[in-house]
Amino acid sequence: MDVLFSIAKTVSELKKRVVVGTIYTNVEDIIQQTNELIRTLNGSTFHTGGIGTQPQKDWVVQLPQLGTTLLNLDDNYVQSARGIIDYLASFIEAVCDDEMVREASRNGMQPQSPTLIALASSKFKTINFNNSSQSIKNWSAQSRRENPVYEYKNPMVFEYRNSYILHRADQQFGNAMGLRYYTTSNTCQIAAFDSTMAENAPNNTQRFIYHGRLKRPISNVLMKVERGAPNVNNPTILPDPTNQTTWLFNPVQVMNGTFTIEFYNNGQLVDMVRNMGIATVRTFDSYRITIDMIRPAAMTQYVQQLFPVGGPYSHQAAYMLTLSVLDATTESVLCDSHSVDYSIVANTRRDSAMPAGTVFQPGFPWEQTLSNYTVAQEDNLERLLLVASVKRMVM
């Protein structure tokens, strides 16, 4: 894998630096590096394709080396270099496409395609010019079963959920109490609602508890807690739990109340947040949100009309908050919202009409992967995203 990365890195640097008018001595290092690459690859035959609609092709490498000059690079020199660049870029893309449609239930982080397996032989070790990227370091650590560290902005750690929990409801659902929740990507939105606005609760305080769990723990977490939950703060017709009828969720946001967010790791309480704003948590794999809705001692007639004593109720008082994970580190590879690598893999597998594999669901959906994230999926995803990043260098 590191050999393919080094080839792509060399091609990428050659493409950027070898331009008409450049002084040769300024690019001599990348020229010599390319020539060493060509000498190593020449005489080798590689095979790509054959899965799905990917065409089969044999690559018999026999490339000319780039010469030296005492002058600036002219158009003829650059054109010769472009021919080498185009050939190697096409070769890299074909290898990456072939690799991205393969998966293995065991040792999924190791190369699976014939070409990548061949490039792992000792003959090509001299090509290993550059393996300093974080992607290569993480892949190398994962393949040795060490603990790599991945850094993510807005990490996609929450499974998609858009539902509710009813704690109380009459036959017509005019008097309802419960939790409305929406989670996706890096966001968890909660609305604790009560049609009576805690009218009959002890001390006029109604308590709500929401439990959440991540499929993988995250660490060094920077998060934001803010009032409001825009995705659940709207009138919505919801089905009842038995799907026999529907009821109107018509929230009115209230400010009276308190909350506590407890963060746990392996069942042990790690940290606690009670205030809005920016917060940090060392590590967690589950969390519990406790909301206490407090009925105000006095209300204007307009507010009382929304929540009349004894009903009927056309609205629900809702205490809302949003938890957003801004930055975090993890020991597991995730779909990165700031990178196109995941979409490159998904699109390649779909465009190639890849047959259903043994590791991922057809279509490579992240939500289904995250909901049942296995070790085999993690290993394969590590390899696939690294290959996608290599392809991206020469696209």
Swiss-Prot record:
GO molecular function, one term: structural molecule activity
Name assigned to this protein: Intermediate capsid protein VP6
Subcellular location: Virion
Lineage: Viruses, Riboviria, Orthornavirae, Duplornaviricota, Resentoviricetes
Role summary: Intermediate capsid protein that self assembles to form an icosahedral capsid with a T=13 symmetry, which consists of 230 trimers of VP6, with channels at each of its five-fold vertices. This capsid constitutes the middle concentric layer of the viral mature particle. The innermost VP2 capsid and the intermediate VP6 capsid remain intact following cell entry to protect the dsRNA from degradation and to prevent unfavorable antiviral responses in the host cell during all the replication cycle of the virus.
Highest taxon above the source species: Viruses
A biological-process GO annotation: fusion of virus membrane with host plasma membrane
Cellular component GO terms, alphabetical: viral envelope; viral intermediate capsid
Family recorded in the similarity comment: Belongs to the rotavirus VP6 family.
